[in-house]
């Protein structure tokens, strides 16, 4: 069973609604009503009632007639004159009379029958019109049967416009195409909304990750900053060896090599050159000798590990073999404590040298590697 829904919008026109940006056809298609019919029907005001003067009634006195032709003329006159019903009939009709076949068949009545029939109608019709008010206006509002002056304008009935077959097919085609166009636009809009939501979520996630990374890096930088600040801090180290009193501007990143090199100057050991007979008391002087006497040669075999563990060769060209340039563990600890006893809390103990640990200068690359390792240890 097919049904339809009718919606009436009063006091508006389609043109006014379109000027306001409301297209009823598109709205209905958007909410899922592709088959719709929108039209504009005028509503005419109701016809005004025209008052006409009442027709004065024609006086008609009841007469006794016996001829059928007279009875027919009386009934015709009563139909033409009496346009309004009786207000009330209070007269009693008395008893019912049988059918008079004589009058109906047009037979000649007898004198006795005519006399009796003349007496009865008089008694029956007596008082029939006593309560009738011919001037009474019994019209009910809205039920007037007066014919207006222009019946064609008053009897207009709105009807659906009948379209030709070609126009109907064209209308259906345009409606289906517009409907499919609206569907594609809605689908594209939904896709755009989904893509925008995904982009917003991705941006929110990226910003959250960036904030977490920034806070983590801030904490790492704070910890590393304190460590770097302590490593870059400048300390004045004074040698406490009797009769020395030399002061060094020392930093943690310089390492202990320079301090050990100074402590070796207070021993009886000589460091020989491997290329000639030159001897000196520390590594710095040996490096200076290489720069002047052997500029094309690399300085090798004079590191911390070689001086402590005895890995370097003992005899050089022109060097007496009885001279021992190595430093024993006990002697190294004694020299270290005699020189830096008041700065042990900064420079630490000499145990690292004795155990053969290789202390190197903190270069930029090593510093970055160390920071990376510290950050990894902090994260895990």
Curated annotation (Swiss-Prot):
From the Swiss-Prot or TrEMBL record, what is one GO molecular function term? DNA binding
In this chain, the stretch annotated as Disordered covers 137-187
**Which Cys-Cys disulfides exist here?**
none
Outline the residue ranges of the record's C2H2-type zinc fingers: 271-294
Q: Which UniProt keywords apply?
A: DNA-binding, Metal-binding, Nucleus, Zinc, Zinc-finger
Output the superkingdom of the source species. Eukaryota
Ranges of Polar residues composition bias in the record? 142-152, 171-187
Q: Does the keyword Hydrolase apply?
A: no
Subcellular location, record wording = Nucleus
Q: Which GO terms describe its cellular component?
A: nucleus
Q: What is its main location?
A: nucleus
PANTHER family given for it?
HIGH INCIDENCE OF MALES (INCREASED X CHROMOSOME LOSS)-RELATED-RELATED, ZINC FINGER PROTEIN C02F5.12-RELATED
Query: How is this protein named in the record?
Result: Putative zinc finger protein C02F5.12
Q: Which organism is it from?
A: Caenorhabditis elegans
Give the organism's phylogenetic lineage: Eukaryota, Metazoa, Ecdysozoa, Nematoda, Chromadorea
